[in-house]
Amino acid sequence: MNSRNIDWKRAAIKHARRTGAHVTTPFETAMPLRGELLSKYAQFYATFWGNGHVPRRTLELCRRRIAAIHDCAAEWSIEDAAAALSAAEADQVRHGRFSTFTEVERAALAVAEKIPFLHHDIDDGDVERIRSGLGEAGTVTLMTALAFFDATARLRIIMNAPVHPAILTDTPLRDGELY
């Protein structure tokens, strides 16, 4: 897809949001036979970003790390603008270098590292480090979000989802689209 097509798609999405029309995103296109499942999935996914228990930046760091572990370009190409990740920070996340992040972010990223292929290696110490920074509700939210980030990356790979770069300026799924 060339840059002209991407610009056209972004303009179409903005127009649809202004007029109230629905825009089908690549992820939605891949799941046309189970609309009710997609709707429930999207509603649940949106709760992580909007409940305030985990900072959006922490969620975005973890989502991008899981995408990098899976080498899922379709998931990696979506950015949450509110997370304010610099190019250097995104590169650190891609390559598993976390020393410059906060203690809570490092704890979350350590667990995110294990979710895709080593989830049985998550121990009480890992969870306690998250709990000490995010509290009980934040820990539950983060652990659930990590599982959904993993599932989303896997679904994108299985469905051969196209790379559709997007910079989200609002909470993911605020308008119902799952990029």
Regions found by a protein language model. Give the residues of each.
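Acidic/histidine-rich alpha-helical segments that form the ligand environment
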Residues: 104-145
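Mobile cap/lid helix-loop segments that border enzyme active or cofactor-binding sites
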Residues: 1-56, 60, 80-84, 174-179
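Acidic/His metal-coordination segments adjacent to aromatic residues that form catalytic metal sites
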Residues: 89, 93-102
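Alpha-helical scaffolds flanking conserved acidic
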Residues: 55-61, 137-142
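Conserved alpha-helical segments that form or flank metal/cofactor-binding pockets of metalloenzymes
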Residues: 57-90
